[in-house]
Each structure stands twice: as C-alpha cells, then as structure tokens.
Amino acid sequence: MAATPAASGSNPRKFSEKIALHNQKQAEETRAFDELMSDLTVSRVQFQKLQQLRLAQSRAQYYGGSLPNVNQISSSPTDFQPSFHPTDNIRGMRHHGLVERVSRNRLHSSHHRPIEKHGRQCDSSPYGSVYLSPPPDNNWRRTNSDSALHTSASSTKSQDPFMGGAQAMLRAPKPPQRNTSLQDGEIDNFGEVFSFPNAMTEENMLNVTKPLPKQIWEAQKVQCITSRPRSCEVPNIKVFPSSDSNASLSHFQGSLNTGGSLPDLTNLHFPSPLPTPLDPDDTAYANISAENSSGLPAAMTHLGISGSPGMQNTRSNPSIQATMNNNSLASNVNSHTPPGRNNPALHPSLRLSSLSNPSLPTSALGTSPRRRHTPVSPLTLTPGSESNRSISNQFSPTSPMNMPPNSQGVSMDRSPLSLPPLEPPPPYPLYSDQPQPHLHHTQQQMHESLDSQNYQPPSPVPCPPLDLNLANSSLSGFFGDSFFDQQQPTKQGKYLWQQQEQYDMFGSPSSSLPNTNAFFDPNMNLQYSQASLMGLGGSHGSLQDSFHLRPNYLYSNCGGSVPNIILTDDSSNSLSKDISNAVAGVSELGFDADNTFQLDDELKLGPLSLDGLSMLSDPDMVLPDPSIEDSFRSDKL
C-alpha cells in the first residue's frame, strides 16, 4: 500500500515534466513560427516594393505621351517574368515549413539571373535596365542588319526629313532576321533609330537624329505635304510644285494627307492649282476654274466669295436647260475691276464656244465623246491666258456701246482688244451629232485677230429683248446667298450700263436689238445687261468682277422664236400679281358651299338618316319623280 502512493506521487512529477517539455517545445515552435512569419512579411514587403518600383520605372516611358507604346507592351511578358521567382521561393518555404530557412540573398539573386546568363552587370545603370527591356539575346543584335528595315529607313529619311526618327521607330518592330547585308558604318548610322530591344523611352527619344537644316527643310516641305502612305499612292502621278504654289498648298493639299483609311481622290479630275498644268489636256480649264474645285473664278475668290455647299460646278449646273443656239452672238461687255488689279488682255485664241452642262442631251450639244467632262457646245469662253486668272474680259465683235466716258464711276476700257473672227453661221452645225474638236485644237485655228471693236458677224436672226424688273426679294430667292455678296465698290454707280443701250449685233439697224432696261436696287450694286443674260455673264472670265451671279445660271435661247423673259417682283403690275389677287379672292370665299356653289335652299343637304342610307345602298330602288333626279344633275349646280 505504501508503494502505491509513492508511485502515485511520482506520476504528477512526470506529468509536470512532460508538460514543461511540451510547453518548451511549443514555445520554441512558436518562436520559430514567429521568426518565419516575420521573414515572410519582410520578404513580401520587399517584393512588393521591388514590384512597385519596377512598374513605376516601366510606366515612366508612358507618362511623356498620351498613348502607350504598343511595341513595349508586346515585350512585357519578358519584363514581368523575373517577378515570379520569389513567389516560387516563398511557396517552397511554406511547404518545407521549419526545415528550410531561405536566406534573403536567394530572394534577390533571382533578379540577376537573366543578366548573369550573359555576363553583364546591371549596377552601372541607374534605371535598372532589366525592367526596361527584354534581355538582349544574340538574335536581337542582328536586328539592324535587316534589309527591309534598311529600305524603309532610307525611304523614310529621304521623304520625311523633318519627321525625325519617330516614324522610323514606329516601323522598326519586325521579326529579327540574320542578314549581313549592311556594313558596320550603316549599322552605326541606324543604331539609334532601330534600337528595338531598348524601349521607346524619353531617354531614347532624345537621342533621335535632329531635323535637317532649314534649307533642306524648305526644299522638302512640299514633297512631304503631298506624301501619302504607300497604300494610297497612285502610280504615274507626280506633282511638281512651282514657286508660287507654296502659299496655296496648305489649303488645297491639306486634305490629301488622309492616310490609308480614306479613299484616294487624286485619280478624280480636279482643276490643277498649278499655273502650268502637268496634263496637256488641262489647258482648257486649268484657267477657267483653277482657283478651287467649286468652279468659282479667281476674281470671286479675291473679292471674298467662297464656294457655298449648295453651289454646283460651273460645268454641271442641272438648272440650265437652254443653250445659245446662235454662235455669232456677242456684245461689248466691259467689266469693272477694283484698283490695284492686273487686267491682262485675253489670248488671241479666245473663242466663243461653250462649257455647257452635262445634263443636256449630247445629241443637241455636239459633245465630244472622249472629253465627256467638258462637252463643247456652241457658246463658251475659253480664255487662253495663263498668267492671271482674274481676267477682265471684253467681247467686242460688235460696234462699241453708245455711252459717255463718265458713266457714274464705271471705268470703260476702250483699248482695242484682239479677237478672232467668227466663222459664218451657215456651215456651223448647231444641233448635230458630230463631235466638235478639242478646245485647244480650235484655239490653234483661231489665230487671226482684229484690232478693232467694230467687227460685225453676219446673222439673219435678231434676238428678242429680255425685260428685267428685279429687286432684292426676287434676286435673293433666285440666286444663292454667296452670289450677291455686297463687296463691290459703291463707286460703280447705280446703273452699270445706261438704260438706252443699243447693240447693233447683226450689222443692220433694222435688225438691231431693242433697248434693254435693267432696273435694280442700288443697294445691290449689281446691274445686268442684255449680254450677261445671253450667257456672256458666266464665270469663265466674262463678268467676273462686276457680277456675283451664279455661273451659267441665266441662259436664254436667242434664236428668234423665244419669247421674252420677264422676271418681276411683288411690287410690279404683272400677271403674278393678278394671279395672287385672284387666289386671295378665292381664299376669302373660304370655299364655303353656300357662297361658292350658291345652292338653292331646297337642295341643301342635311345629315343622312337611315332611310337615306338605305336608299343609297339599294341598287334596285328607282326615284319616284324624274324631276328630283334632274335637280341633282351637275348642270344644275
């Protein structure tokens, strides 16, 4: 019995020792666990700091521009690849637990592995080049010897000198090829442009070759403006700019540099802005509407009139449905020019032929089939003068106008103008299917000239008068807004031509045209004569300075069988006023059945009843009294 308490007394001591040992082991394990966790937290914090530093350095190149570099993003998987090695080491520590204590040197040694592979040091670079570019393998060292890159670089440097190396660097990322076609000097020249393994950071952008000197800049400016991507290049079209075309290139050719996403419109025919057109066929209308593509002459552009969106081309006005069928019709038209403007005389090859609209039938116009865009019809102005497009023209195949020199501020140019003699009308087909020759061919034929203004072409048919009573309301509705731009000098006077002008058009006083009165509002500063309404007031240089009217808008058939054209406003006593009064009188009636038809009281209809509906729907029902049927007939109403 005594051994039992001794044994029982020794048991608690053993348990206490076991408990003490257990607590000691637990404390050691807890201490080891705390050390491990502290190591993990320290390594995790350091890893996060390193990752943030690397991301901040890699993002520093994006902060300079508005868009990220796509080429650098494509190489980003190799940038972030070293960041996964510390996580693998941490996982290894977690799996091994207390057995393996990972030293901190191993955490950082993984970052040096890509560089130690190539035997290079990263301590000399303040930015840590490991995180800025992928490891430069041997394949990347041969990038600069790519023949395709050399071709694109040489073409880029020759065409776009002031673009610098930025455009060449955008074209740089091509698959690396081993090619030893370049010499060492060429590799050195293109090394800083095609350093693709190094990312396009601001440091690299500062090393780009500087623009060329100012002389080469000015020489290459025009070619660089007109240069387009190769997807938009049109073969066999080369623009050689002249000395005076640099001022207008920024406005005219600014829309050509559109890139590859928009269609190339250079194959369409627009008038050439050059004074000497490249195409020999452009001589006919390089001078007519070469100022802009909307057909406005140069004088309108100088006076401040720009082409409105609603303005149509001069040669394709669909509103013209009549042409001049008398080819010998002309009159003495003197246009007033503002001071300080050169007014060269017309070329002797000025010819009265026409740029009519393509909407007219070609059989009636005698259109040349191979020059469909400029059909030749009997009356047109094709001035051959190429020096200045703001031409003040005179057409004087007739006797001079009876007009005093001091015609209310209008300067009349009485100098003789050489004009070609017009062919007699009988052998000249007006409405035929035969195509007429080219304009430049007819200009070569018309080389003779007259030094007088008294040439009288024979014609048997007089032209009827055209009466005009136009005011602001009718003119503003008849023409567009930009054609009545009030920029003409007010000294031009109230009437440009006097009211009693006689045009001895056809050689005999008996067949001369009647007097034409042109009444206009003096605020408009626009006066029209008989000649301007006969087609001589178009935009082809005839009345460019005096008339701001729509080109080729007023045409009239002057064949002898055409009635008078009377354009009136609301204030004149005309047929339109009578019609408006009649319509107003009818509208006053209100179309009331009582007042309009004046039915008898017994014939006034009331609301239909069921009996009336049954009578109307019954086809077999006959009216009992024929007098009732007679009363409903239309002749009674």
Curated annotation (Swiss-Prot):
Region called Disordered, residue ranges: 105-184, 269-288, 299-462, 615-637
Bias (Pro residues): 418-429
Modified residues (Phosphoserine): S66, S133, S145, S293, S377, S396, S561
Residues found modified as Phosphothreonine: T143, T151
Pfam families named in the record: TORC_C, TORC_M, TORC_N
Primary role: Transcriptional coactivator for creb1 which activates transcription through both consensus and variant cAMP response element (CRE) sites. Acts as a coactivator, in the SIK/TORC signaling pathway, being active when dephosphorylated and acts independently of creb1 'Ser-119' phosphorylation. Enhances the interaction of creb1 with taf4. Regulates the expression of specific CREB-activated genes such as the steroidogenic gene, StAR. Potent coactivator of ppargc1a and inducer of mitochondrial biogenesis in muscle cells.
Localization annotation: Nucleus; Cytoplasm
InterPro entries registered for this protein in UniProt: TORC (IPR024786), TORC_C (IPR024785), TORC_M (IPR024784), TORC_N (IPR024783)
Organism: Xenopus tropicalis (Western clawed frog)
Biased composition (Polar residues): 145-159, 309-337, 377-395
Family: Belongs to the TORC family.
Coiled-coil blocks: none
Comp. bias (Low complexity): 344-365, 396-407, 430-447
Keyword Transcription regulation on entry: yes
GO annotations of cellular component type: cytoplasm; nucleus
Complexes and interactors: Binding, as a tetramer, through its N-terminal region, with the bZIP domain of creb1 enhances recruitment of taf4 to the promoter. 'Arg-300' in the bZIP domain of creb1 is essential for this interaction.
Compositional bias ranges of the Basic residues kind: 105-115
Main location: nucleus
Domain of life: Eukaryota
GO biological process: protein homotetramerization
Keywords: Activator, Cytoplasm, Nucleus, Phosphoprotein, Transcription, Transcription regulation
Gene Ontology MF term list: cAMP response element binding protein binding
UniProt name for this protein: CREB-regulated transcription coactivator 3
